[in-house]
Amino acid sequence: MTTPTAVALEDAKVAFRLGDGRVYTAVEKAHLAVAQGEFVAIVGPTGCGKSTLLNVAAGLLKPAAGSVRIFDRPLAGLNRDAGYLFQADALFPWKTALDNVAIGLEIRGTPRAEALPRAQKWLASVGLGAFANRYPHMLSGGQRKRVALAQVLIRDPKILLMDEPFGPLDAQTRQVMGNLLLDLWNADRKAVLFVTHDLEEAIALADRVVIMSAGPSSRIIGDWRVTLPRPRDIFEVRLDKEFHALHREIWSVLKDEVMKGYAQSTQAAEAV
């Protein structure tokens, strides 16, 4: 039986009109398909449109050309099948960890008496069962990310859109969060589209690694399948010979785009 395609971008183009009337094309002719249960990571230079593609999949941006399909249906408006985990915390500072997780159900009409036990269960699943009554300012960066992850997963989205969710964390905490994410993902294998600047993180987590070119008019220029066995341990998989071979292969392409992006940003700064 064919695995359903959760997200499909066909020749998607994203353009913005600038203040001086010019049109800036961020992404052009993007073709990307994510199967149900597949974990796909997007890597590319700063400003190449990685987050832009994620916003298109979320329905937050409408492409100027091309199409977006979610489970073989044209996307019209917000993607109701997706949960979005941002780089910045989206926690309410005046609410406890428990209330921050429960609110995702409450705003959809779930009675509070039902939402709270479910929120407590999700906090326990991310290792924070004993921290339910703490406020965000009382939690570490990694703990806040766990709350944010539970906040998204409690709504049981079919698709996870993740925009550098572990970017602000230190290297060790990022690896801990990576293992936690894989454990939760292995439980029900949602479709995941994960944006990161970190090629090692992408290879360690994903089934496929997609590379974008430097912008403007960024395109998808490479798509590598990661055949490292699962389940994976983020701490151990980076020592694997296959991991290093794949990293070298992808970096040989990505490095050129990173340098192009750096040169373009330097020229733009000098022109100001």
Predicted regions and their residues:
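The feature captures the beta-strand-to-loop junction immediately N-terminal to the Walker
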Residues: 43-45
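Conserved ABC transporter NBD signature motif
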Residues: 66-77
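Short coil-to-helix segment of the ABC ATPase nucleotide-binding domain corresponding to the Q-loop/switch region
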Residues: 95-102
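Helix-to-loop junction immediately C-terminal to a conserved catalytic motif
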Residues: 58
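Conserved ABC ATPase signature
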Residues: 135-139, 143
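A short, proline-enriched helix->beta-strand linker immediately N-terminal to the Walker B motif
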Residues: 154-158
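Conserved ABC ATPase "signature" region
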Residues: 102, 106, 113-131, 183
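Hydrophobic anchor residue at the start of the ABC signature
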Residues: 149
